[in-house]
C-alpha cells in the first residue's frame, strides 16, 4: 500500500500526470479537426511551414518523432503527436480521413516517400506536398502520389 502511494506521488511530482492529461486533451482536439493539414516533421522546414499555417490560421496538426522537436512544437502552441509519421496508425490518429492535405517535411527523401505512400494508400484523394532534397527523388515522390514537391 505504501509503495503504491509513493509511486503515485512520484508520478505526480514528475509531471507525468500533467503530460498524460495534456496529451489526452491534445488527442481530443485533433479528433475534432476537419479539413485540416497534417504536417509531418518539425525541423527547419516544418517550423517554417507551421509558422505560415499559424499566420494564415490554417488548421493543422504536427507529427514529430523526435522528443526535443515535439516539445518545441507543443511549446510553440501547436497540436502535435509524438510518433513516427510513416506509421499508418499515426496518420489515422492525426485525422487523415478528415484531412484535406499533408505536408511531408521530414529530413530525408526516403522518409517523405514512405509517408507519401502511406498517406495515399489510406486516403487516395489527399493532397500531398513533399519536401525533396535530391532531383532524382522528385520523380519518385510524384510517382508515389505527391501532388507537389518543395525544395528547401
Segments and roles (model prediction):
Residues 1-152:
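Cytosolic regulatory regions of ion transport systems
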Amino acid at each position: 500500500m505504501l509503495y503504491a502511494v509513493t509511486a503515485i506521488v512520484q508520478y505526480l511530482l514528475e509531471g507525468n500526470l500533467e503530460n498524460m492529461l495534456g496529451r489526452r486533451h491534445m488527442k481530443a482536439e485533433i479528433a475534432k479537426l476537419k479539413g485540416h493539414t497534417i504536417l509531418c516533421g518539425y525541423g527547419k522546414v516544418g517550423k517554417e511551414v507551421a509558422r505560415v499555417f499559424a499566420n494564415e490560421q490554417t488548421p493543422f496538426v504536427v507529427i514529430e518523432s523526435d522528443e526535443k522537436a515535439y516539445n518545441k512544437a507543443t511549446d510553440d502552441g501547436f497540436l502535435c503527436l509524438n510518433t513516427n509519421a510513416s506509421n499508418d496508425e499515426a496518420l489515422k490518429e492525426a485525422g487523415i480521413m478528415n484531412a484535406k492535405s499533408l505536408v511531408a517535411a521530414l529530413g530525408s527523401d526516403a522518409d517523405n516517400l514512405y509517408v507519401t505512400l502511406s498517406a495515399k494508400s489510406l486516403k487516395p484523394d489527399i493532397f500531398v506536398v513533399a519536401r525533396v532534397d535530391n532531383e532524382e527523388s522528385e520523380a519518385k515522390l510524384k510517382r508515389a502520389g505527391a501532388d507537389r514537391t518543395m525544395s528547401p
